Amino acid sequence: MTGKNVLIICSDEHSRSALGCYGNSIVQTPALDKLAGKGMRFSRAYTPSPICVSARASLATGTHVHENQCWSSSQPFHGQHDSWMRRLRDHDHATVSVGKLHYRSGNDDNGFSEEILPMYLANDGKGWPHGLI
């Protein structure tokens, strides 16, 4: 494959103040710091919604919550709107999602050529570490 790679890391409940590349001297984030040193960092980034599913749907589609209709975590994104992932995939780029997105279903066209789900989602709840918290 030729061309540039794009890596988007989306983290719930994560503040830039918890990263070494933004000046935190206690929290050690060497891999993210290295990526930030070679890539792009934002000094003013805001979430379109305090609800994780709504924010992910807005990030995926470039639309506001009132446009994508994902008002809460009980109304998951199901790929009904155009997304940057779908556009890249449809132009022969591999688009891979790793982790939980809480989209409605893996059967929906979410725009990813591959989705790697956490064990507790991929195995109908088997493997979820219930006793650890």
How would you name each of these model-derived features?
Residues 1-133:
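Formylglycine-dependent sulfatase
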